C-alpha cells in the first residue's frame, strides 16, 4: 500500500522587539518552554529548527514541519501561540505544501531518490536554502515530451552537485505558490554554483517567480531561539551533532 503524502509547512518567525529587553532569565525561561513544546511533538513527524538571524532582515527562525494532516500543523501552531513567547512571535512568511512523486522521473532511478518520495526525509545539511516557486502558465501548455526533456536536463545539472540535496513539495491549490523547494548542503558555495548553472537551463525560461529566498542554518531549537532572543550565541554544532539532531526530532 502506498504511503500517504505528508503535509509540509515552512513557518518563518520574527521575534518582536519588546522581547529583547526582557531580563535574560525571562528570555531563557521562554526559550525553555518553547523548546520543550517543539521537542514533545508526535513521534514520526518531522520538526526542524533553523536560524536566519543576520541572514534575512524580516525573520529570525524557520520551523520546518512535516505531518500526516493539515490539522496537525494547525494544532502545533496553536500550541506555540499559547506559550509565554507566542504573542511576540510574528509569522513573517508561511508556505504550505505537500509531498508528491515527480511526474518526470520515469525509469530514472538512484538510491533514496528525492522525486519519488511521499514523505519528507531531511538529510541534515548544515544549511537550508528555501524558496517558493511559480511557473509561467505557458509551461503547462507544452507537450509532456518537451517538459520531460527539459527536466532531464535539469536533473543532469543537479547530479553534478551530489553534495546538494533537494526537497521539492507541491502547493497547487494549497497556497499562493506552486512549489516550495528546499536545498540542503554543508557548503553555501556549492548551492550558489548550482543555481547559477540552473539559470542557463531550458526550463529556467519558464519560471515566473522564485523569491523570496531564505538562507537558513540548522540548529537545535533551543540554540535557534537563543540567537533570536539575543542570548549567548550557541557554539557551532558539528556534523555528527546535526545528524543526531535530525534523527531525534524528525523520527528518522
Stretch-by-stretch model annotation:
Residues 38-59, 87-101, 155-180, 194, ...:
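Short, glycine- and small/hydrophobic-rich beta-strand elements in well-ordered beta-sheets
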Residues 1-42, 68-73, 94-160, 172, ...:
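Short S/T/G/P-rich N-terminal loop/turn motif that feeds into the first structured element of a domain
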Residues 53, 66-67:
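Short gly/ser-rich anion-binding loops that grip negatively charged ligand groups
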Residues 75-83, 193-199:
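Short amphipathic alpha-helices in soluble, non-transmembrane regions
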Residues 72, 85-88:
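Short helix C-cap/helix-to-loop transition motifs enriched in small/turn-promoting residues
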Amino acid at each position: 500500500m502506498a504511503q500517504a503524502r505528508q503535509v509540509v509547512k515552512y513557518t518563518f518567525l520574527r521575534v518582536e522587539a519588546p522581547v529583547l529587553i526582557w531580563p535574560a532569565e525571562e528570555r531563557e525561561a521562554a526559550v525553555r518552554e518553547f523548546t520543550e513544546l517543539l521537542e514533545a511533538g508526535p513521534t514520526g513527524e518531522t520538526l526542524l529548527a533553523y536560524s536566519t538571524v543576520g541572514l534575512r532582515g524580516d525573520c529570525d527562525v524557520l520551523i520546518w514541519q512535516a505531518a500526516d494532516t493539515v490539522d496537525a500543523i494547525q494544532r502545533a501552531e496553536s500550541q506555540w501561540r499559547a506559550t509565554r513567547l507566542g504573542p511576540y512571535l510574528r509569522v513573517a512568511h508561511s508556505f504550505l505544501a505537500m509531498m508528491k512523486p515527480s511526474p518526470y522521473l520515469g525509469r530514472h532511478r538512484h538510491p533514496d531518490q528525492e522525486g519519488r518520495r511521499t514523505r519528507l526525509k531531511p538529510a541534515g545539511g548544515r544549511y537550508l536554502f528555501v524558496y517558493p516557486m511559480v511557473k509561467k502558465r505557458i509551461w503547462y501548455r507544452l507537450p509532456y515530451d518537451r517538459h520531460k526533456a527539459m527536466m532531464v536536463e535539469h536533473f543532469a545539472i543537479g547530479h553534478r552537485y551530489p553534495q546538494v540535496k533537494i526537497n521539492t513539495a507541491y502547493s497547487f491549490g494549497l497556497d499562493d505558490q506552486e512549489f516550495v523547494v528546499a536545498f540542503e548542503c554543508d557548503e553555501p558555495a556549492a548551492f550558489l554554483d548550482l543555481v547559477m548553472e540552473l539559470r542557463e537551463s531550458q526550463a529556467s525560461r519558464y519560471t515566473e517567480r522564485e523569491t523570496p529566498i531564505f538562507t537558513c542554518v540548522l540548529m537545535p531549537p533551543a540554540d535557534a531561539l537563543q540567537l533570536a532572543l539575543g542570548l549567548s550565541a550557541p557554539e557551532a554544532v558539528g556534523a555528527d551533532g546535526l545528524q543526531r539532531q535530525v534523527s531525534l526530532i524528525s523520527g528518522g
